[in-house]
Amino acid sequence: MANRYDDNSIQILEGLEAVRKRPGMYIGSTDTRGLHHLIWEIVDNSIDEALNGYGKKIQITLEADGSVTVQDEGRGMPIGQHASGVNTLQVIFTVLHAGGKFSSEGGYKTAGGLHGVGASVVNALSEWLTVEVAHDGELVRMEFADGGKKIGKLEHLGKTNRTGSTVRFKPDPRIFSTTEYKYDVVCERAREEAFLLSGIAMVVSDKRNKKNETEKYLYEDGLTAFLEYLHEDRNVLMNPVKFSGEANGIQVEAAFQYTDDYQENTYSFVNLVRTGDGGTHEAGFKGAFTKAINDYARKYGLLKAKDKNLEGGDVREGLTTILSVSVPEGLLQFEGQTKSKLGTPQAKTAVEAVVSEKLSFWLEENRNQSDTLVRKMLKASLARIAARKARDEIRKGKRVGKGEKVLSGKLAPAQTKDARVKELFLVEGDSAGGSAKQGRDSHYQAILPLRGKVLNTEKCTLADIEKNEELNTLIYTLGAGVGPDFDYKESNYGKVIIMTDADDDGSHIQILLLTFFYRYMRPLLEQGMVYIALPPLYKVTKGKTTEYVYSDQELDALRRKLGKVEIQRYKGLGEMNATQLWETTMDPSQRTLIKVGISDGVKAERRVTVLMGDKAELRRKWIEDNVSFTLEDTFDLEG
């Protein structure tokens, strides 16, 4: 019988019910990323207070019971009667799109919390939430439970001389796949906010263990400190340059610094909200920066009349930029609820005006350094032309039969043509590759053995990559281009799974491949298309029963349970036959995969720098401290 679709099929979701029904629409996901997003929905409100001159400290506490407390020194949320007839505090926490940031009369000149859904969404997705507010001499409290239902009335706690808001909430385990917060993730984000809020302290405390850890982040020259933090383990070519200005009522603050790397990195913010997908402000910065450089180069003869202008990629090779703009509420436009891309047209012209004036002045005042930078850019231009030819060969296979030759005898392709379901296993070694080819489901699983040495691409150009057989093969196999031309939508595979031995060499191959993906196919990571397979460490046998174990802790528990057992330690994938490899590592119903993503671009950038940069001692120490080749500690750009 077909499902009926009539008048009774139409549902109206009341209040916060819509948030619980479709949480991804409001916080992006219900995994660890969405979980941490709850904190920042509340913190953003506290930051908006600080941004407008109210308060010098924001405290975030991970409580022992799994809840989170956010406390600020702002004016305190309004606690009187709202025009709707309900207490204003209740309106803030139970009504979507209720807030003081929708008009210039709302109490905020600039604010990141534009949509007015932050507090109510956190309430909707919490097991319980309490809010205490010190406002106009009064201290009050209101409590909610079970997805935002108010408990009792507004409680008056007495008089107070302080001001501010304290929100404590516990995420609902019925909504989230995990409710355990990562202290280091919260600290990284708090540090980032402190860089942008010069003079404002961000404090993070963890009361969940005996250490009772606390970190305080306070910077007087935030953007310069931000660059120094990012480049702590890099070779810089100059001191940080910082400038600020205002145009069209929009405040612009920027800092930049060159390193000896080939990649560019831009970290942009609007009203302290990270815009990971860029937007009009980034476009304005990049356009004005490139124009100022070209104007300078032509003025002083570094570019001749017959020469073409330097392109943006030439100018920004090795450039790290921090761009922070403050946009008045009346002009603020984000594309989407997650606020990852700015859409305000006026921001582009404002940033262009400030950057054009300030950068042109700096170039003139620092002629020797400016000339050195332009000569570096001219070399980058020549390398770009060579790399473009290499990319054309990679993408189009200009040499006759080159694509077939590259893949010949290596790739065991999948039968299906549906890229969405296809999986590409990158397997360490020929022997394991052979077992994987025999054990796989050939309908949708393809195997590409890695035979030679994978290149460390942290210090390479695209021309270097084109000469490396293993990476060249991988690029052809994925079929989506490389570098600036890469388009994840063109990928021949929906999943790319790295499958290596659980030892030092296997870990190193993982890191080399992840570095390549991060530098030259980053959208694969951003879209969650890259995974690490976890093969078992042990085969445990007792009688006719066999179990596979993935960590030493799991082995100890199994030995206590079963008593005397026979244990086989797998030193490599090649020690498993085709059936065992399928059952333990490749079968979707049995295997364990770790998705490698980028939840924190700053942290990912620093981690890749440490692991793959030219400072071997830092790399050795990080691997010793962080990698034990178990389920818990596999390399992950998110972690």
Outline where the language-model segments fall.
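C-terminal interaction appendages of subunits in large macromolecular complexes
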Residues: 382-403, 418-423, 434, 438-440, ...
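GHKL-family ATPase ATP-binding module
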Residues: 1-9, 16, 40, 48-50, ...
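Short conserved segment of the HATPase_c
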Residues: 79-98
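Residues immediately C-terminal
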Residues: 48-49, 76-77, 504-505
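Conserved short strand/loop->alpha-helix "switch" segment adjacent to the catalytic nucleotide/phosphoryl-transfer site
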Residues: 21-40, 109
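Conserved ATPase-coupling elements of RecA-like P-loop NTPase cores
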Residues: 52-54, 79-82, 437, 509
